[in-house]
Amino acid sequence: MDYESIQNLHAGDHFNFKGLEWVVLDPDKEGGVLAITADLWAENVPFSQEYFEGCNDWRKSTIREKVRGLMHKIGVDNLLPHIVDLVADNGDKLYGTMEEMVFLLTCDEYRKYRDVIPKYRRWIWTCTPWTTTSTGDASNVRTVSSGGSLNTVSYTHLTL
């Protein structure tokens, strides 16, 4: 499907843009479409390179910089801001929310769009922490297995 017909897209539709294949999650999201890449765009990327207090915080993560590299490929003018809710799996809201142009899905977004998200050949990161620095070990992050289940792994595991 070409870019000019983006207004006609439906959840689950595939389209090509800027050399990547995308899957529509939400065809009417904040004036555009919310989409995810149809295939893994990178592999063996840790959430954070090293341990530090809060290394599972998306705002401070290594992977955030890797994801932000997609902005240059896609072009900032082709992106719309999105509020990412960094609430931990246990409900702790310490990490807050932030506005991003490119991002990993949260667990809540994964649950919402699960029916149209591709099952990748490897597990993928979300930006949802297991817990935050206010509740103990803040080094684990929620992931989605290749089979589609939500799991928790340490910030250093390699994938994506």
Language-model segment annotations:
Residues 1-158:
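Collagenous Gly-X-Y triple-helix signature in extracellular proteins
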